[in-house]
Amino acid sequence: MRYQASPALAKAPRALLCIHGAGCSPAIFRVQLSKLRAALREDFEFVYVTAPFPSSAGPGILPVFADLGPYYSWFESSSGNNNNGPSVGERLAAVHDPIRRTIVDWQTQHPHIPIVGAIGFSEGALVTTLLLWQQQMGRLPWLPRMSVAMLICPWYQDEASQYMRNEVMENHDDDHDSKDTEWQEELVIRIPTLHLQGRDDFALAGSKMLVARHFSPREAQVLEFAGQHQFPNRPRDVLEVINRFRKLCVTVQTLE
């Protein structure tokens, strides 16, 4: 099976879609999120998707998770000639397939436990961002309405922003000058999000750029923690993550 969902004996009333990082797997992501899962076990089930492309282990995976392969990534490695490679839109089509299948599988097995939000890590956080944006643009009718999201140490490429800009400008019939403010606003995601940024993360600059370019300052909360490319480890940081995420969920009435 190329995708995984939570155990069959689901008890929580709602679920979160979990999108792992590059060179990772659902089994590894379960371990990475263990503290969060324990704290939210009464509130959420965690539904894991397996990325479509086999790959080598990602940053920080070895040697800790050497026994939890194989590893998968969301985008195929570049051949070095980007001009002849697939576009972002084409690559997203490959990304959508395992996500859609996982959602259908979950909805079939657990029709009374809706998926209401998402958690993405590293490359998976970039995938989550693109999913949120596409849904906001009225696309992806198969994707459950995402009310809240947590993005952990996002990996960012300007190519993703360029894809979004091109899509928006096409919707405005190339009338860029007269509608500059309007189409710029369409690049901004407007659901409550929590962005976790490790102060020593190699991807920190890109993480900051992603939230600045594509998330509403009124809806996005940024939490920096002492750490690298990982979910926070220190108990006080974990507690802060949990408290902030719960408050976001209450804001959108995902939690009472």
From Swiss-Prot:
GO terms for biological process: lovastatin biosynthetic process; polyketide biosynthetic process. Lovastatin acts as a hypolipidemic agent that works as inhibitor of (3S)-hydroxymethylglutaryl-coenzyme A (HMG-CoA) reductase (HMGR) which reduces HMG-CoA to mevalonate and is the key step in cholesterol biosynthesis. Lovastatin, simvastatin and related compounds are widely used to treat hypercholesteremia and reduce the risk of cardiovascular disease. Furthermore, statins such as lovastatin were found to be anticancer agents. Its EC number is 3.1.2.31. Gene3D superfamilies: alpha/beta hydrolase. One of its GO terms (molecular function) is hydrolase activity, acting on ester bonds. It is an enzyme of class 3 (hydrolase). InterPro entries: AB_hydrolase_fold (IPR029058), FSH-like_dom (IPR005645), LovG (IPR050593). GO terms for cellular component: cytoplasm; nucleus. Keywords: Hydrolase. It comes from the Eukaryota. SUPFAM superfamilies: alpha/beta-Hydrolases (SSF53474). Disruption phenotype: Strongly reduced lovastatin biosynthesis. Low levels of lovastatin are released due to complementation by other esterases. The active site is at 122 (charge relay system), 201 (charge relay system), 229 (charge relay system). It catalyses: dihydromonacolin L-[lovastatin nonaketide synthase] + H2O = holo-[lovastatin nonaketide synthase] + dihydromonacolin L carboxylate + H(+). Pathway: Polyketide biosynthesis; lovastatin biosynthesis. Esterase; part of the gene cluster that mediates the biosynthesis of lovastatin (also known as mevinolin, mevacor or monacolin K), a hypolipidemic inhibitor of (3S)-hydroxymethylglutaryl-coenzyme A (HMG-CoA) reductase (HMGR). The first step in the biosynthesis of lovastatin is the production of dihydromonacolin L acid by the lovastatin nonaketide synthase lovB and the trans-acting enoyl reductase lovC via condensation of one acetyl-CoA unit and 8 malonyl-CoA units. Dihydromonacolin L acid is released from lovB by the thioesterase lovG. Esterase that catalyzes the release of covalently bound dihydromonacolin L from LovB during lovastatin biosynthesis. Belongs to the LovG family. This is Dihydromonacolin L-[lovastatin nonaketide synthase] thioesterase. It comes from Aspergillus terreus (strain NIH 2624 / FGSC A1156).
